[in-house]
């Protein structure tokens, strides 16, 4: 545990611990529980969380749940019928057809008692589904969760409530969504909540990331889905030339296209001295950026969709002790990763592989991962 600006930060690296934290937080809620997840499955873990929410409602706690309709499309609406009947608010984020159809609410949070100064929030990249709560050695997704206990948690309450109101409103306008993303993103302090979405220009979270990367000389990235725009790749390459840059991507996933898309970027980065690693132990789902003394942690992948389109929530932490903790975590992940050497990579850069990588990069930057997951791109 690290204390930052009066808030306790607790890192959760194991799947079973994250599920236990969720049920414990819901079980100890006194006034309110607010949840927001991209995927809320109807499996054992989903039922366990739903039943904990139902118990909270029955003891007088106000409960609201916002899930992405596309991400949770496999879970029928009647799964939440008991929650609604008990008085909870359950909303599916479902923008209308047209250009808004591509918009996904990719944020993940559990906010408990946000009205009080000692509220808590659990953030990270994981969803409510069995695979996110299994141990890594049992085939679970490798991810991180972070509990923030203290006044910073409550600062998320108005953002959540505004987004819920927008999602429930018929005919809600995109410009209203852009306004609330801008309004509630923070630009000062040791802990800053920053949000991303379909802005006309660059979102607050993407702008903050760009600034920190521009100034960075020691960069560490763990990105399960790594397909950033060329402007970001050039910035990472610059750090590789002038300082030190290390990137861990996935070697295993339920979506081969995302692995191949990341490999499309390797050549340019390695030519500039960036060290590339692929995580071997299990499927990787972590989203972590460390730029010198700043850490960005939350829901956002390091790709074009997350940077410029999806609704995302990240916490920027400017604290030397917490940064040291996350650098130690990064070093531990290197132990379960394989470095991609220049010599080995040159042997794999066949014409067919480069074609697969390029096609995959195009598709994952233009199409939702849930769609590309159904495509078969083969290995390498």
List PLM regions with ranges.
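Charged, low-complexity intrinsically disordered terminal segments
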Residues: 1-380
